[in-house]
Curated annotation (Swiss-Prot):
It comes from Pasteurella multocida (strain Pm70). Gene3D superfamilies: GHMP Kinase, N-terminal domain. Its EC number is 2.7.7.56. The keyword tRNA-binding applies. Homohexameric ring arranged as a trimer of dimers. This is Ribonuclease PH. Keywords: Nucleotidyltransferase, RNA-binding, rRNA processing, Transferase, tRNA processing, tRNA-binding.
Length: 238
């Protein structure tokens, strides 16, 4: 039996709270069960040097975890003087995923930075970050359309992300920490609304997985992402 007696294809309760902070152009608190991430979007009327004069915009992301977001206190990366490899990998994943949902030429020569700060971690922080940052990005871009800065909305699709894995030989969706730490296979899937995949990150931590198991995990991820898209749409409709 899974924690909280969830079905194998059932994500944790998902909640998206928009306009969570007052200064950012977009801000969201996203919750997947006990995992909670604050996602904020900042618009700047400039682009990185390598894009100057290219008539296109840029979307990037930063990711971090509060020291006591985990069971025991983590040292702040700022105190260490550098970001860890895991942090860099995750923020690049978030940025790639969000760029896929935006027509960067239609965005014009401006940048949007998504800051994803984990305030409580119980597994799936990177997938929760992508899911929440997507909504924060939509709000930031909607503001640019509303104030006349943009004539056309450059959003092509929502994006959602979810973890899937094999725990005790059983494929399951949206792993929390106790499942993730015991999983034989762990996979993160990022998806567009039409079902196309932006990223699939999968690793056999124990026994290698079969082609059939891979297809089962991808089907679980697609089903889970469709539920997430419904939550995102409902949040954006409020």
């Amino acid at each position: 039996m899974r924690p909280n007696e969830r079905a194998n294809n059932q994500p944790r309760p998902i909640k998206i709270t928009r306009h969570y902070t007052k200064h950012a152009e977009g801000s969201v608190l996203v919750e997947f069960g006990d995992t909670k991430v604050l996602c904020t979007a900042t618009v700047e009327e400039s682009v990185p040097r390598f894009l100057k004069g290219q008539n296109q915009g840029w979307v990037t992301a930063e990711y971090g975890m509060l020291p006591r977001s985990t069971h025991s206190r983590m040292q702040r990366e700022a105190a260490k003087g550098k970001q860890g490899g895991r942090t860099l990998e995750i923020q690049r994943l978030i940025a790639r995923s969000l760029r896929a949902m935006v027509d960067l030429e239609a965005l014009g020569e401006r940048s949007i930075t998504l800051d994803c700060d984990v305030i409580q971690a119980d597994g799936g922080t990177r997938t929760a970050s992508i899911t929440g940052a997507c909504v924060a990005l939509c709000d930031a871009i909607h503001g640019l359309v509303e104030n006349g800065t943009l004539k056309v909305n450059p959003i092509k699709s929502l994006v959602a992300a979810i973890s899937v894995g094999i725990v005790e030989g059983v494929p399951v969706c949206d792993l929390e920490y106790v499942e993730d730490s015991a999983a034989e296979t762990d996979m993160n899937v990022v998806m567009m609304e039409d079902g196309r995949m932006i990223e699939v990150q999968g690793t056999a931590e124990g026994e290698p997985f079969s082609h059939e198991e891979l297809l089962t995990l991808l089907a679980l991820a697609k089903e889970g992402c469709q539920l997430i898209f419904d939550v995102q749409r409902q949040a954006l409709a409020k």
